Swiss-Prot record:
Organism: Oedogonium cardiacum
Encoding gene (name): psb30
Transmembrane helix listed as a keyword: yes
Protein name (Swiss-Prot/TrEMBL): Photosystem II reaction center protein Psb30
Membrane topology: Single-pass membrane protein
GO biological process, one term: photosynthesis
Lineage, uppermost ranks: Eukaryota, Viridiplantae, Chlorophyta, core chlorophytes, Chlorophyceae
Keyword list, A-Z: Chloroplast, Membrane, Photosynthesis, Photosystem II, Plastid, Thylakoid, Transmembrane, Transmembrane helix
Family label: Belongs to the Psb30/Ycf12 family.
Annotated transmembrane regions: 5-25
Description of how the protein assembles with itself and partners: PSII is composed of 1 copy each of membrane proteins PsbA, PsbB, PsbC, PsbD, PsbE, PsbF, PsbH, PsbI, PsbJ, PsbK, PsbL, PsbM, PsbT, PsbX, PsbY, PsbZ, Psb30/Ycf12, peripheral proteins of the oxygen-evolving complex and a large number of cofactors. It forms dimeric complexes.
Compartments, as annotated in UniProt: Plastid, Chloroplast thylakoid membrane
InterPro entries: PSII_Ycf12_core-subunit
């Protein structure tokens, strides 16, 4: 398996997972949740 493709997929997965989490954390901190 190509390491470059694997690392790119992992980076995309991490971004897609952390994106909503950060938004939820910011919203809950601001009391908008």
């Amino acid at each position: 398996m190509n390491i470059d493709i694997l690392s790119q997929l992992i980076a995309i997965a991490v971004t897609l997972f952390l994106g909503p989490v950060v938004v939820i954390l910011i919203a809950s901190r601001n009391g908008n949740l």
